[in-house]
Curated annotation (Swiss-Prot):
The active site is at 70. Necessary for the introduction of cis unsaturation into fatty acids. Catalyzes the dehydration of (3R)-3-hydroxydecanoyl-ACP to E-(2)-decenoyl-ACP and then its isomerization to Z-(3)-decenoyl-ACP. Can catalyze the dehydratase reaction for beta-hydroxyacyl-ACPs with saturated chain lengths up to 16:0, being most active on intermediate chain length. GO terms for molecular function: (3R)-hydroxyacyl-[acyl-carrier-protein] dehydratase activity; trans-2-decenoyl-acyl-carrier-protein isomerase activity. Belongs to the thioester dehydratase family. FabA subfamily. Disulfide bonds: none annotated. Pathway: Lipid metabolism; fatty acid biosynthesis. It is found in: Cytoplasm. This is 3-hydroxydecanoyl-[acyl-carrier-protein] dehydratase. It comes from Xanthomonas oryzae pv. oryzae (strain KACC10331 / KXO85). One of its GO terms (cellular component) is cytoplasm. Signal peptide: none annotated. Homodimer. Keywords: Cytoplasm, Fatty acid biosynthesis, Fatty acid metabolism, Isomerase, Lipid biosynthesis, Lipid metabolism, Lyase. Its EC number is 4.2.1.59, 5.3.3.14.
Length: 171
């Protein structure tokens, strides 16, 4: 498939099934773990470091699966799901630029949570800036990311790392 600059939810779910890119390419998780509804922008230029950018959105609805269990009587989106979305988008970037293998989160340098996503929110926006891509024996992307809810920044993560592996047997 030709690289696009934006992707719909149906295309992202096709990625989860291995139908969007080459069969040996990385995949996004399927529902309900896919944590964004669309990628509105993806490029291997631009961003804060000039090495690439990814922008994505998640429509918030009170019936999203995590609100029913986290927490009963005090529904809030788990912070780890927002962080996972940032790793998902970083891995998608690697697949989008042609990296082969299975994506795995490798860590991050720093994470700050300064707000929360409640069922009354409308829109979560993810902004990912690629700071480094290694494409040798080790295939890895490093990014900085922000998560905004209804236009207000609530999560910041620095030095997110995702690698691509041809075998995860001994991972």
């Amino acid at each position: 498939m030709t690289r696009q600059s934006a992707y719909s939810r149906d295309q992202l779910l096709a990625s989860a099934r291995g139908e969007l890119f080459a069969p040996d390419s990385g995949r996004l998780p399927n529902d309900p773990m896919l944590m964004f509804d669309r990628i509105t922008e993806i490029s291997d230029t631009g961003g804060a470091h000039g090495k690439g950018v990814i922008r994505a959105e998640l429509d918030i609805r009170p019936d999203l699966w995590f609100f029913g269990c986290h927490f009963i009587g005090d529904p809030v989106m788990p912070g780890c799901l927002g962080l996972d979305a940032m790793w998902q988008l970083t891995g998608f970037f690697l697949t989008w630029i042609g990296a082969q293998g299975r994506g795995r989160a490798l860590g991050c340098g720093e994470v700050k949570f300064t707000g929360q996503v409640l069922p009354s929110a409308q829109l979560v926006r993810y902004e990912i800036d690629v700071s480094r891509v290694i494409n040798r024996k080790l295939v890895m992307a490093q990014t900085d990311a922000r998560m905004l809810v209804d236009g207000r920044e609530i999560y910041v993560a620095k030095d997110l790392r995702v690698g691509m592996f041809t075998s995860t047997e001994n991972f």
